[in-house]
């Protein structure tokens, strides 16, 4: 069956179901214009939707139309004839400190007899050149989609220059993409009915679906109202319509539990789910159940930036920056012992999207 989520959410599945879509775990070969126009998820920052498919990593092929070099990375503008997107490509550490290119042969220009050292140098030089591109070169990039300062870009996990003198690779790509769109990306996501519960007798009252809707409702409320902290009774009313709808569908089949009990149970599960995701956290474990919203907690953001600013001055962290576990330990000492790694990673992602910090590797960060 095709998933139906109502008029307001027809374009976005609950996050708990994303893993069932094979597109989610693949590098999607989309046109750049579609990557630029994809809507960001309201549930999880850094996830985007092309129609009903959740996407966070892509595979693009195009011509380099501009190039900017920094100490640790290159910024390439890649054009596939539908649009241009900025690709952030980190330099390989083994090439950073290498000066000029490696040459083989003697001073007269004639090649010498076979020499294993010269051959290895030649292979290394060829490998180095494949990671340094100029305007007009054909570049293939795989990476994650990011939004920085309201501009969409790709943070490369792998990239290389494509040697395509006969344009065979580009022609193959031009023929492949329309078929991928027609057979996969433009098709609505479908899954077996038993994954959502009964198709007609209460699919929207299925516990997993109900929890997904509650999580989405609470996330949208916290984002729209820019809530910094709250107590459970402050947001309980948001779940009333969900329970009322669910109770009406189940009324004919079974008596069910009381309304207040259902609301309390769903609220507890929703808050637990958001805590596991790192979206909310409790700064102090007290009887007064107060939750802080990670993306709105300015004090947490300041603590993270202070740790990075102070520790990256030390020689040990000057080049790569601070590792996530080091940041977590330091922030726990100065802000809250209850901080989890999931909360820290959500905060780091938020700060990076606002260009307050930058990741130098998968798990190292520096402050700008």
Curated annotation (Swiss-Prot):
Residues 58-162 bind DNA. Coiled coil: none annotated. Disruption phenotype: Morpholino knockdown in embryos results in decreased red blood cells and an arrest in T-cell progenitors, as well as increased vascularity. The vascular defects could be rescued by wild-type gene and by thalidomide treatment. It is found in: Nucleus; Chromosome, Telomere. One of its GO terms (cellular component) is CST complex. It comes from the Eukaryota. Keywords: Chromosome, DNA-binding, Nucleus, Telomere. Belongs to the CTC1 family. The lineage of its organism: Eukaryota, Metazoa, Chordata, Craniata, Vertebrata. Residues 2-192 are annotated as: Interaction with CTC1. Residues 296-368 are annotated as: Winged helix-turn-helix (wHTH) 2. GO terms for biological process: telomere capping; telomere maintenance; telomere maintenance via telomere lengthening; vasculature development. InterPro entries: CST_STN1_C (IPR015253), CST_Stn1_wHTH1_sf (IPR042082), NA-bd_OB-fold (IPR012340), RFA2-like (IPR040260), Stn1 (IPR014647), Stn1_N (IPR018856), WH-like_DNA-bd_sf (IPR036388), WH_DNA-bd_sf (IPR036390). Component of the CST complex. It comes from Danio rerio. Component of the CST complex proposed to act as a specialized replication factor promoting DNA replication under conditions of replication stress or natural replication barriers such as the telomere duplex. The CST complex binds single-stranded DNA with high affinity in a sequence-independent manner, while isolated subunits bind DNA with low affinity by themselves. Initially the CST complex has been proposed to protect telomeres from DNA degradation. However, the CST complex has been shown to be involved in several aspects of telomere replication. This is CST complex subunit STN1.
């Amino acid at each position: 069956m095709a998933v139906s989520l109502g008029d307001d959410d027809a374009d976005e599945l609950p996050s708990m179901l994303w893993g069932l879509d094979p597109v989610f775990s693949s590098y999607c070969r989309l046109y750049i214009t579609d990557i630029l126009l994809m809507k960001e998820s309201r549930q999880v920052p850094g996830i985007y939707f092309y129609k009903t498919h959740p996407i966070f990593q892509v595979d693009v092929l195009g011509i380099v139309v501009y190039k900017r070099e920094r100490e640790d990375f290159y910024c390439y503008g890649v054009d596939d004839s539908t649009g241009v997107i900025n690709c952030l490509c980190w330099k390989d550490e083994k090439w950073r400190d290498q000066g000029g290119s490696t040459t083989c042969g003697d001073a007269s220009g004639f090649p010498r007899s076979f020499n294993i050292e010269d051959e290895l140098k030649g292979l290394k030089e060829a490998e180095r050149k494949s990671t340094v591109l100029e305007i007009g070169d054909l570049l293939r990039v795989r990476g994650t989609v990011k939004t920085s300062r309201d501009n969409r870009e790709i943070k490369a996990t792998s990239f290389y220059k494509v040697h395509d003198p006969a344009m065979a690779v580009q022609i193959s790509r031009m023929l492949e993409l329309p078929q991928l769109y027609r057979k996969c990306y433009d098709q609505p996501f479908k899954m077996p009915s038993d994954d959502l519960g009964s198709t007609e007798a209460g699919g929207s009252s299925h516990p997993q679906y109900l929890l997904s809707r509650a999580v989405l409702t609470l996330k949208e409320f916290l984002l729209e109202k820019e809530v910094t902290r709250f107590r459970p009774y402050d947001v309980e009313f948001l779940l009333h319509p969900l329970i009322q709808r669910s109770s009406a569908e189940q009324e004919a089949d079974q008596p069910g539990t009381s309304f207040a009990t259902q609301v309390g149970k769903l609220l507890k599960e929703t808050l637990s789910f958001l805590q596991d995701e790192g979206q909310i956290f409790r700064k102090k474990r007290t009887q007064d159940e107060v939750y802080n919203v990670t993306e709105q907690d300015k004090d947490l953001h300041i603590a993270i930036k202070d740790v990075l600013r102070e520790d990256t001055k030390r020689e040990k962290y000057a080049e790569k920056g601070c590792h996530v576990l080091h940041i977590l330990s330091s922030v726990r000492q100065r802000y809250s012992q209850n901080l989890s790694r999931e909360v820290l990673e959500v905060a780091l992602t938020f700060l990076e999207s606002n260009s307050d910090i930058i990741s130098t590797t998968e798990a190292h960060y520096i402050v700008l």
